[in-house]
Amino acid sequence: MSKVIGIDLGTTNSAVAVLEGGQPKIITNPEGARTTPSVVSFKNGEIQVGEVAKRQAITNPDTIASIKRHIGEAGYKVTVGDKSYTPQEVSAMILQYIKKFAEDYLGEEVTEAVITVPAYFNDSQRQATKDAGKIAGLDVKRIINEPTASALAYGLDKTETDEKVLVYDLGGGTFDVSVLELGDGVFQVLSTNGDTRLGGDDFDEAIMNWLVENFKSDNGIDLSKDKMAMQRLKDAAEKAKKDLSGVTSTQISLPFISAGENGPLHLEMTLSRTEFDRLTSDLVDRTKAPVMNALKDAGLDANEIDKVILNGGSTRIPAVQEAVKNWTGKEPDHSINPDEAVALGAAVQGGVISGDVKDVVLLDVTPLSLGIETMGGVFTKLIDRNTTIPTSKAQTFSTAADNQPAVDIHVLQGERPMAADNKTLGRFQLTDIPAAPRGVPQIEVKFDIDKNGIVNVSAKDLGTNKEQKITIKSNSGLSDEEIDRMMKEAQENEEADTKRKEEVDLKNDVDQLIFQTDKTLKELEGKVSDEELQKAKDAKEELVKAQQENNLEDMKTKRDALSEIVQELTVKLYQQAQEAQQAAGGAEGNATDAKTDDGTVDGDFEEVKDDKE
């Protein structure tokens, strides 16, 4: 069975890992980095992903970042030129890039993956993530929650002990907290909570707003209206945030950020950690309620938690670490890298699926309650939040009016008492109900949630056994046909990218060969015949002509022809050098013989061995 890779598809950064020798290992990207920016840019018809795309963000308006914040969002599209892309398509570009360099590392095709999502993602967001994987050419074997993945990475070699673990996961765009029980190889999620609109991006924004306000106060210019200046501010804010995890103050210096009446203006400000903590205290405080709710739902007090694991790059912020310590009474565990733990845990789950990891069982939960709308617009729950999945639950309902021929089933997810305040997952209708007084027909509504947290709902008239089913699709509205079309486009893009790379490699080869030929011909002057030199020069000129005309097929043919001629000449050069060396060696030998004839006597010697040996 081929390897099942584990992918942490993050808001700001993504990572990929694979199980090797029973241990998960991060796969580095082509730049040698262990994480890859979740950024996509479009330039001259080419799609670029990762660090190269992030570097263009200031100058290239066709750059997309933090697309995960919109995945599963109905109707949301990003327009680039004359084309629009759904969040699934953009996410698929990131996944496709990750898939490619994972294949390069493993030396084999990768078709299966485990992808992580924030624990508090709803059904639409989970389904959309799965769709993104499919578009990228991946069979997503399992969707698992990010905090659960972290716990898998932490607890893989600790299966002998029983521990209650709280995972605090503050990433680039989302926040989750989960409480798990670990023991005998079973990883059971007791509860989960979070905020899908809170993350490191918000901390960056707080610094950006502070910079904008101060610059406006000093210079009377509002930088928020200058797109290029704002991108520079964003980069500087992110860097300052990271710096303040290690130092107590940092200098933010952005020359030529704007221009005033008297010429260019420069931004020079010092941000202290104290000021940063003041600017972001409300963001840190927003994470407290989910922590307390997760503990409450798990039926535990903070003092019953054995370990606190921090996950996500934003947990490096000292104020965050201090707050978690105060709320839980525990010093957070730093044994796993917060940027890599999720991908490592996903790789462990991949190993469970492929059979490489034995005796590990993962029991996850549904993050939000599921139910239907009933009379009066009330949300009636069938499955409560934090129920272990996979699970199934049925409940019987009846008609609201006499002789009602059909019932509309409105499927919802959320915690609010009224249907209108919760997230609609789907609607379907059960028809042909026999005429009967109100309350007589028996309609059984059944919910099934699979191990990925994806929902199936059925409604059955118990009198006639007529049944209607629905698999809840992503609210992004992607049909199977659209997904197939996007898969095809993604494949075409990959083929086009491969072709472009081959073109660049060919041009580089040609440049290198022309340079090498000039150098070799100079060395060969006077050492080979003029006829041979001219043959090489003519072949080189033909290649230069093909290069100038940008004729790729001609370039290949002429490159191969010139390469062969140069190789033959180089071999000749080496042969000549060798012959000269041998001739010199022969002359030296003759000189030695002559010396011996002059009366030098060769002496015999006998090796004397030491008796002590």
Swiss-Prot record:
Transmembrane segments: none annotated. Residues 577-613 are annotated as: Disordered. It comes from the Bacteria. Keywords: ATP-binding, Chaperone, Nucleotide-binding, Phosphoprotein, Stress response. PROSITE patterns: HSP70_1, HSP70_2, HSP70_3. The keyword Chaperone applies. Residues 599-613 have a biased composition (Acidic residues). The modification Phosphothreonine is found at T174. It holds the Pfam family HSP70. The keyword Phosphoprotein applies. GO terms for molecular function: ATP binding; ATP-dependent protein folding chaperone; unfolded protein binding. Induction: By stress conditions e.g. heat shock. InterPro entries: ATPase_NBD (IPR043129), Chaperone_DnaK (IPR012725), Heat_shock_70_CS (IPR018181), HSP70_C_sf (IPR029048), HSP70_peptide-bd_sf (IPR029047), Hsp_70_fam (IPR013126). Acts as a chaperone. Belongs to the heat shock protein 70 family. This is Chaperone protein DnaK.
